[in-house]
């Protein structure tokens, strides 16, 4: 069993405060939940196991046992997970408060050691000091944490995480904040605690302490689509799809990093617990991460030969053509916005190709095809600009003075005409590289304006942010019939 989970189970019996705070789903009756093969550490009980997604943020960070309490590190409720979650700049004073909370909830003194020893020795075969029977005493106080960056905010979830070498398929990475504290002082605190333990347990305690207090902070991970619930990815192509999150809330009103101080006043803490309740929010999945995911899927279905074709149909409506017919059975086309972007982008590029290159049929092999395959991946701006520049140069532009120009004298559809008129003021006959980049951007931004999108979905917002957006009716953000811009 995980050391942190064992400690919570045993120390929960000490007093009323501990019984309220140290109650973990991992130590209660098991309830079934959706499991995946994603491996990592449950933030609630700190054990390494198979994880399921959290109902509060939809990220995989909770085990099947702890999921029954629906606790999230972004909650506004003073449960243990929230109280050991710190944000952004963590000061020495903040860490001192955390250590004091640990020492209050998991004390080690002669009275406590004798009490647990007597209980354990009531079993006939437990006269020896074996680690499996005294595992709760072997949790040192460290500044080990799992960290994650969400839209500019860095969160540190402190705890005692065993088996740091094991596989980690979550967006969290290990961070050691001992350098923000006093190393010798933390050593002294742990040596004082260790002194009350039997000699055979002291050695194990020391080994665990030094291994969890002297490690090097890992490089921070980037959160990706695979870190979120599979249910999101399966329904992402429905423009009407919304995400539902459930958050634990209360009338707790303290600075984010001061939540661990609440247990200093026990009566006030229990008053706050009485106000605990859950709130649910329906949230739009719109963000750069999920937009890029959808555009990447569409990119895999691209038939670049269309830009050399003479089809009268739109790019997604060509049938019975070996070189141009796309797979219309793909779920990505259920999002009409993807279809519109695909059709207009390829209508415009075809007009450029036909105006500047001598191509006559979609069966011809052209060098430009390779460059077109990633034209929808606009979320990586620098790479996309280089790609459009490459396409432009393959159109055999004419150089006059310092600028290069390409022709535009082939038919285009009404949507592209409107884009040209709105962006340039007319339908031009010659275009520069900047014009081509600008037009392609506007075609895509008309439906997926990544300039004004957050990187991760609103499921990673704090309760206060969600409440503010909900009051302004901005959590759903749009209906299926209008674009991101509108």
Swiss-Prot record:
Keywords for this protein: Host cytoplasm, Host cytoskeleton, Host-virus interaction, Inhibition of host innate immune response by virus, Inhibition of host IRF3 by virus, Inhibition of host IRF7 by virus, Inhibition of host NF-kappa-B by virus, Inhibition of host RLR pathway by virus, Interferon antiviral system evasion, Metal-binding, Phosphoprotein, RNA-binding, Viral immunoevasion
InterPro entries per record: Rotavirus_NSP1
Main location as per UniProt: host cell
Location of the region described as Important for cytoskeleton localization in the Swiss-Prot/TrEMBL record: 82-176
GO cellular component, one term: host cytoskeleton
UniProt GO MF annotations: metal ion binding; RNA binding
Subcellular location field: Host cytoplasm, Host cytoskeleton
Residue numbers spanned by region Interaction with host IRF3: 317-486
Post-translational modification remark: The C-terminal region is phosphorylated by host CKII/CSNK2A1. Phosphorylation of the DSGXS motif is essential for host NF-kappa-B inhibition.
Segments carrying motif pLxIS motif: 480-483
Coiled coil: none
Chain segments carrying region Zinc-binding domain: 42-79
Annotated spans, RNA-binding: 1-81
Entry keyword annotation includes Metal-binding: yes
Location of the motif IKBKB-like degron (ILD) motif: 479-483
Domain of life: Viruses
Assembly: Interacts (via C-terminus) with host IRF3; this interaction leads to IRF3 degradation. Interacts with host IRF7; this interaction leads to IRF7 degradation. Interacts with host CUL1 and CUL3. Interacts with host BTRC.
Protein family per UniProt: Belongs to the rotavirus NSP1 family.
Notes on the domains: The integrity of the zinc-binding domain in NSP1 is important for degradation of host IRF3.
Protein name stated in the entry: Non-structural protein 1
């Amino acid at each position: 069993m995980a050391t942190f989970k064992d400690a919570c189970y045993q120390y929960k019996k000490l007093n009323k405060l501990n019984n309220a705070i140290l109650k973990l789903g991992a130590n209660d009756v098991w309830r079934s939940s959706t499991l995946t093969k994603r491996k990592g550490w449950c933030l609630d009980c700190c054990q390494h196991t198979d994880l399921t997604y959290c109902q509060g943020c939809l990220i995989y960070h909770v085990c099947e046992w702890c999921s029954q309490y629906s606790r999230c590190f972004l909650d506004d409720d003073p449960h243990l997970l929230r109280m050991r979650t710190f944000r952004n700049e963590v000061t020495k004073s903040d860490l001192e408060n955390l250590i004091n909370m640990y020492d209050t909830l998991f004390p080690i003194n002669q009275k406590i050691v004798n009490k647990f020893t007597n209980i354990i020795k009531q079993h006939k075969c437990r006269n020896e000091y074996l680690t499996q029977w005294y595992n709760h005493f072997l949790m040192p106080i460290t500044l080990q944490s799992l960290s994650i960056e969400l839209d500019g905010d860095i969160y540190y979830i402190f705890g005692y995480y065993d088996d740091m070498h094991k596989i980690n398929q979550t967006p969290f990475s290990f961070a050691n904040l001992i350098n923000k504290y006093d190393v010798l002082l933390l050593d002294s605190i742990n040596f004082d605690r260790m002194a009350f333990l039997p000699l055979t347990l002291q050695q194990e305690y020391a080994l665990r302490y030094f291994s969890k207090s002297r490690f090097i902070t890992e490089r921070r991970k980037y959160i990706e689509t695979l870190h979120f619930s599979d249910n999101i990815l399966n329904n992402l192509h429905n423009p009407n799809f919304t995400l539902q999150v459930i958050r634990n809330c209360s009338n707790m009103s303290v600075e984010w990093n001061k939540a661990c101080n609440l247990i200093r006043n026990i009566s006030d803490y229990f008053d706050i617990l009485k106000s605990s309740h859950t709130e649910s929010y329906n949230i739009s999945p719109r963000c750069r991460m999920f937009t890029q995911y959808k555009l990447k899927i569409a990119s895999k279905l691209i038939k670049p030969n269309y830009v050399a074709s003479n089809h009268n149909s739109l790019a997604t409506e060509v049938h019975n053509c070996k070189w141009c017919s796309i797979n219309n059975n793909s779920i990505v086309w259920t999002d009409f916005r993807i279809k519109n972007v695909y059709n207009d982008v390829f209508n415009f590029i075809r007009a450029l190709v036909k105006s500047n290159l001598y191509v006559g049929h979609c069966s011809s092999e052209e060098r430009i095809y390779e460059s077109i395959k990633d034209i929808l991946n606009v979320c990586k701006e620098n790479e996309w600009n280089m790609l459009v520049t490459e396409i432009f140069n393959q159109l055999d532009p004419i150089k006059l003075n310092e600028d290069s120009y390409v022709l535009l004298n082939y038919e285009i559809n009404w949507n592209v005409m409107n884009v040209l008129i709105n962006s340039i003021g007319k339908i031009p006959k010659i275009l520069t590289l900047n014009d081509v980049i600008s037009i392609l951007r506007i075609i895509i931004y008309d439906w997926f304006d990544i300039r004004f999108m957050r990187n991760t979905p609103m499921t990673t917002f704090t309760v206060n942010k969600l409440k503010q957006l909900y009051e302004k009716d901005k959590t759903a953000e749009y209906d299926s019939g209008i674009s991101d811009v509108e």
